[in-house]
From Swiss-Prot:
PANTHER family: PORPHOBILINOGEN DEAMINASE (PTHR11557:SF0). The modification S-(dipyrrolylmethanemethyl)cysteine is found at C244. Its EC number is 2.5.1.61. This is Porphobilinogen deaminase. The keyword Magnesium does not apply. Binds 1 dipyrromethane group covalently. Pathway: Porphyrin-containing compound metabolism; protoporphyrin-IX biosynthesis; coproporphyrinogen-III from 5-aminolevulinate: step 2/4. It comes from Listeria monocytogenes serotype 4b (strain CLIP80459). NCBIfam families: hemC. Belongs to the HMBS family. It catalyses: 4 porphobilinogen + H2O = hydroxymethylbilane + 4 NH4(+). Tetrapolymerization of the monopyrrole PBG into the hydroxymethylbilane pre-uroporphyrinogen in several discrete steps. GO terms for molecular function: hydroxymethylbilane synthase activity. It comes from the Bacteria.
Amino acid sequence: MKRKIIVGSRRSKLALTQSNWVINKLKENYPEFDFEIKEIVTKGDRILDVTLSKVGGKGLFVSEVEQALSDEVIDFAVHSMKDVPSSLKEGLIIGAIPKRESPLDCFVFNRVNSLDELPQGSVIGTSSLRRAAQLLKHRPDFVIKPIRGNIDTRLQKLHAENFDAIILAKAGLARMGWLENTTLKLEDIPPELCLPAVGQGALAIECRESDQQIRDMLTSIHHEETGICVEAERVFLKKLNGGCEIPIAGFATRANEVVHFKGLVGNADGSIILASEQAGANPSEIGNKVAEDLLSEGADTIIKELRNI
């Protein structure tokens, strides 16, 4: 039996923080094992001067990590779930999904303290088409400007490049300890205004389907409710063949064994937003049903047009 486990991670501060969090959780259950992180640079890490939607393709932040997993260079990998394509590389599975952090997006303001205080024509930093489309539907006067880099870099750019606000995932801020920073002017964005990305706030721990030892180990940190909700979201994403070049969002919650799921697809400027909600016990059925609702409303036309731009 293996005593040293090699964990694959991107080398960003957030990715390493997440990987160390997973390792510490596993050490509580398996103190006899040693864990070592292997840092892997992905295509998404290398290309910083182009927005993700223009880079195109899927798995920009996971493909190289998945290859290392397939080649048995690493034993499992820790990803942000929202970066993981809806179809995994052959022979790989999601071995565990720990309890979800906040799925919300949040504003970080430069001068004001709330969305309502932002003046007409405010410049908002985000490279996410999903965030941009939903925000423009609410405030078409906003000017959306792309912003790339890790959390620290984007927070520096907020002031250095004179944005009125930038949008970040609250989970990343929480994991990096920024929510305790009282100098930041933060405001949560409710799902009614900006529905989160599929899997946002959740981690995906990926392993080889054939590696039963690792699979057994990972089940100890799997969170069933998060897994059920993320299943609905990812089935929805797969049905629509979504990627970062499409403004697509999906968020599920669960109460009393009933999954409530809302999904949406829009065009880039937010002038068209198609949305549907469903509830039921079976997460796959609910995710599929919402996707079918949107396809019947013309989502496939929007998706094809965006992919041809």
